[in-house]
Amino acid sequence: MNKRDAFFALASRPLRSTQVMVEGEVFTLRELSEADASEMEVAMQDKSGKFDYARHRMLLVTYSLVDDEGKRIVDNWEQLKAFPRTIIGRLYEACLDLSKYDEKEIRDLAKKSGEAEG
């Protein structure tokens, strides 16, 4: 297989997933596709175009949390506002690791949106 074919074959690789125990219940998180990540990064901005850290946490969980068939469990990130921070935080940390977001990338997203100073 040539390099071009080998590269494009990677697109058919299944997205990785992991299971996380929260309050005695096991939940499945799936890594983001590039399309999901791009869509989510646009949705992270508030009405004025500023990066919203709280929205980022909830969106990452929304896009990653799936049922046994691989379908998203949460329809709208705002549904997560009622959850305890410890639960969203536990899921969020696992999502960061799974989709390879790190604090530097999150700060860069904030800078690009104009919120953070640099």
Regions found by a protein language model. Name each.
Residues P14-L15, V22-G118:
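Short, surface-exposed, charged amphipathic helix/loop patches that serve as local interaction elements
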Residues M1-P14:
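Extended acidic low-complexity intrinsically disordered regions
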